[in-house]
């Protein structure tokens, strides 16, 4: 059963309904669900779906010819295969689809280009001369994000400016991901999402009839299951110096987020080299560099500023719990690793993913105009500002601190400060006062609202004071079941 991806399906169907030729580039990291999304889109439509392989150009051309000939095109009456790519690709115009769009999907298109670098030029010539004004739709799909972004979509590439649509597929959000385990409790949905993230391939390995703990033991920590070797497989497929990348990813997963800290923890002494490795991981969609939501452009461009974090929840889980315990897992001590390593730390581990869930919740509320104001920027904030200090005369002091979620309107005259707590105890009154104390200097020229997000409800004092302090309270049930 196909789950989610309504936005992607709408985008593709809208393009399909448009008149004239359509040339779509759809790309994203491996396992994100591109192929399945395209196959779902093709259902009920006459089409050719061709999956490229890592092979020689003559074999690729032969395989493409074989696939095209199955569509009963006129050429099959006098040839068994095309002799060149220009004739092969032009044959799209001969597909016997009547008034329907002649739909061609080329999956893993970078493999085709690697075997024959002239493919983009051939396609460009056909597009300019014939395809642009014809009833065709060609979708070029690929996982090699660096190739697509730096070469295929660059100004130097023959296809530059020809695409009528460019769509970068990202992993599913929380609300789509939890459709894979609809009967879980609200808390378990957050825990499962914290472990798996929004990668469909990972979500399908999960048995929704088993508990979160049992799934972790059976489908992640047990040698031989798909997810046990997934991280190692992906890194070896995409990168060369896997031992170094392992060290860097582990350092980030364990909470080292600054460039210098990552370099020291991973024992890559040269930060410039560490920066290059991190850049490669960012291109693969495994790591991202996060700057404060109000950072200026100069700060955003400086790799020494901001923090690095793993964007893939499953990578974060594996390097937090599996990677350092592989010897025990290889010996079959799955229960021991789970009981003594994973289970005690899982709620704390999930608290980071809960922040992502809360940010997604806020984005969805904005779509429905259910926030106090419309924000222009939303994200994490870090820097020096006021914090609560009862020993100080004013009750405040200046210190480095973070804000889980900060929304700022277009004029920077209205703010929403959000704090997220994923724990079994209610959001305490002391934590509430800590939240109110932050960014006090800005309150002289801006209106402030507050939003508290909690797994286990709120202290009664908070509930009593919330309205007069412009504080919105969102319990777990409200967040998880919003959509």
What is each residue range found by the language model?
Residues 1-336:
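Phosphate-binding site recognition
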Residues 306-483:
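A cross-kingdom feature that marks ATP-driven nucleic-acid transaction machinery
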